[in-house]
From Swiss-Prot:
PANTHER family: G BETA-LIKE PROTEIN GBL (PTHR19842), TARGET OF RAPAMYCIN COMPLEX SUBUNIT LST8 (PTHR19842:SF0). The modification Phosphoserine is found at residue 141. It holds the Pfam family WD40. SMART domains: WD40 (SM00320). It comes from Schizosaccharomyces pombe (strain 972 / ATCC 24843) (Fission yeast). The target of rapamycin complex 1 (TORC1) is composed of at least mip1, pop3/wat1, tco89, toc1 and tor2. The target of rapamycin complex 2 (TORC2) is composed of at least bit61, pop3/wat1, sin1, ste20 and tor1. Interacts with prp2. GO terms for cellular component: cytosol; fungal-type vacuole membrane; nucleus; TORC1 complex; TORC2 complex. This is Target of rapamycin complex subunit wat1. WD repeats lie at residues 1-35, 38-76, 81-120, 122-161, 165-204, 213-252, 257-296.
């Protein structure tokens, strides 16, 4: 059966989770246009490549790379080397390599041309999240012991180790697209904010503020592309939207509608919409100006725990 795919410029939402499927949705119509069976494990995280051609799916213990613009069920590439759940994926801006983190306690850097490990960094604790600094020369990661680490790819070493709350798992980190700030959220619902200063090509991290974002676990924190807002997802079934103006972190809006834990979120490119994934099996598209759900994506029959958005404009 031939499947018709939306044109390149349309908005594509991808969701996945514990039902072993990856679902592609036309974001505006809510139509599921493609389903990939991910038979051997749940999917923990999704990431779309900078050129919008590929989708990386983090499972246990593999990472699989899929072609977004075909109907094939088969991955183009499988990255093998982790020994436990893969928790995060980040693509380098030119797409030549990607980085991953895992509950096996490591951060790995992979060559995209041949799926081999180029770098291996040991956290000595399960790693919960990972990202690439906008300067493309540093990795930032956080772990179950409460540590946030910065890794200099040029020096091939850990340059910062931050421990805001000892033995409180740090669940998520996010960095401003302009490299201005780093934010980490933990299992007590607290967010920690650091100002990022450039010193001779390397980042200096200056503590700014701690605030309680939720009463329960933070599952994900994400800065908007324009760095004007922070979204925090939580076990309390809500998403809070915070203003970053003057590092004030005033609560602007609470997004309510999910029935269970909200695990993941992603902003639209213009920072005006947010997509979320929840244990209630549903993904949602929110208009941030009104706080309203404008589209629901129902199709998963177990928890939806990760989303990715491939958009140019909504």
């Amino acid at each position: 059966m031939s499947v018709q795919y939306p044109p390149q410029h349309s908005v594509l939402l991808v969701s996945s989770g514990y039902d072993h499927t990856i679902r592609f949705w036309e974001a505006l119509s809510g139509i599921c246009s493609r389903t990939i069976q991910h038979a051997d494990s749940q999917v923990n995280r999704l990431c779309i490549s900078p050129d919008k051609k590929f989708l990386a799916a983090a499972g246990n213990p593999h990472v699989r790379l899929y072609d977004i613009n075909t109907s094939s069920q088969m991955p183009l590439m499988t990255f093998e080397g982790h020994t436990n759940n893969v928790t995060a994926i980040a693509f380098h801006c030119d797409g030549k390599w990607l980085a991953t983190s895992s509950e096996d306690g490591t951060v790995k850097v992979w060559d995209m041309r041949a799926p081999s490990v180029q770098r291996n960094y040991d956290h000595k604790s399960p790693v919960n999240d990972l990202l690439i600094h906008p300067n493309q020369g540093e990795l930032l990661s956080c772990d179950q012991s409460g540590r946030v680490r910065a890794w200099d790819l040029g020096e091939n070493s850990c340059t910062h180790e931050l421990i805001p709350e000892e033995d409180v798992p740090m669940s998520s980190i996010t960095v401003g697209s302009d490299g201005s700030m780093l934010i980490a959220g933990n299992n007590k619902g607290n967010c920690y904010v650091w100002r990022m200063l450039n010193h001779q090509g390397a980042s200096l991290l200056q503590p700014v503020v701690k605030f309680q974002a939720h009463q329960r676990y933070i599952t994900r924190c994400v800065l908007s592309p324009d760095v004007k807002h922070l979204a925090t997802c939580s076990a309390d079934a809500t998403v809070n939207i915070w203003s970053t103006e003057d590092m004030s972190f005033m609560l602007e809006r609470r997004l309510q509608g999910h029935q269970r834990w909200v695990w993941d979120c992603a902003f639209s490119a213009d920072s005006t919409y947010l997509v979320t994934a929840s244990s209630d099996h549903v993904a949602r598209l929110w208009e941030l100006s009104s706080g309203e759900t404008i589209r629901q994506y129902s199709g998963h029959h177990k928890a939806a725990v990760c989303v990715a958005l491939n958009d140019y404009q909504i």
